[in-house]
Curated annotation (Swiss-Prot):
SMART domains: Ribosomal_S4, S4. Keywords: Ribonucleoprotein, Ribosomal protein, RNA-binding, rRNA-binding. PANTHER family: 30S 40S RIBOSOMAL PROTEIN, SMALL RIBOSOMAL SUBUNIT PROTEIN US4M. This is Small ribosomal subunit protein uS4. It comes from the Bacteria.
Length: 203
């Protein structure tokens, strides 16, 4: 499965948003773009550049490559409601994102690894596809043989409980969670403007 393999810290500095816990620490020390002239870059940013930057933020935050991201956009357009809201809701329903939101991993990249390595079940069945879209009422849990793995315990211990949203019910003691509902747009606190992405794709 294709995924981004470059430096997420450099991308975070370029976009001005932390895309991982490690990148968050770097941004605190160096809150400017990488490179020799990172601190001195000035000038008016074009509308297209702003739109492109917001798209990049969304793609990197959710760990989605261009082709798949565009497919999410097309699906969002075909649904009723506000296209931007629909796009965010689709991304929030991704299996790897829900694992991250539930506090089973400190990062979406880590959550993606847990999923692809087959550690988790959805409604009692193994699902190893990060892009699988959960529905309200879907229950996820770690496989029995994965319950006591050091990697799983470490992943959960490093994920802050304070981040768990109201639309996911979590039982950390038993390593289980239920996806209660698709969140409304205002419930998703992420540093991007999806409307600019809609404007970019609708040209």
């Amino acid at each position: 499965m294709a995924r981004f393999r470059g430096s997420i810290t450099k991308v975070s500095r370029r976009l001005g948003v932390a895309l991982s816990p490690k990148a968050e620490k770097y941004l605190e020390k160096r809150p400017y773009a990488p490179g020799e002239h990172g601190q001195s870059r000035r000038g008016k940013v074009s509308e297209y550049a702003l739109q492109l930057r917001e798209k990049q933020k969304m793609k990197y935050l959710y760990g989605v490559l261009e082709k798949q991201f565009r497919n999410y956009y097309k699906k969002a357009v075909s649904q009723r409601g506000i296209t931007g809201d629909n796009l965010v809701k689709l991304l929030e329903r991704r299996f790897d994102n829900v694992v991250f939101r539930a506090g089973f991993s400190p990062s979406r990249a880590g959550a993606r690894q847990l999923v692809t390595h087959g550690h988790l079940l959805i409604n009692g069945k193994k699902v190893d596809i990060p892009s699988y879209l959960l529905k309200p009422g879907d229950a996820m849990e770690f496989r029995q043989k994965s319950q006591n793995l050091d990697a799983v315990a470490d992943s959960m211990n490093r994920a802050p409980d304070s981040r768990i949203p109201s639309w996911i019910q979590v039982d950390k003691a038993h390593k289980k969670a239920v996806f209660l509902a698709v969140p409304e747009r205002e419930e998703v606190q992420e540093p991007f403007n999806e409307q600019l992405v809609v404007e970019l794709y609708s040209k």
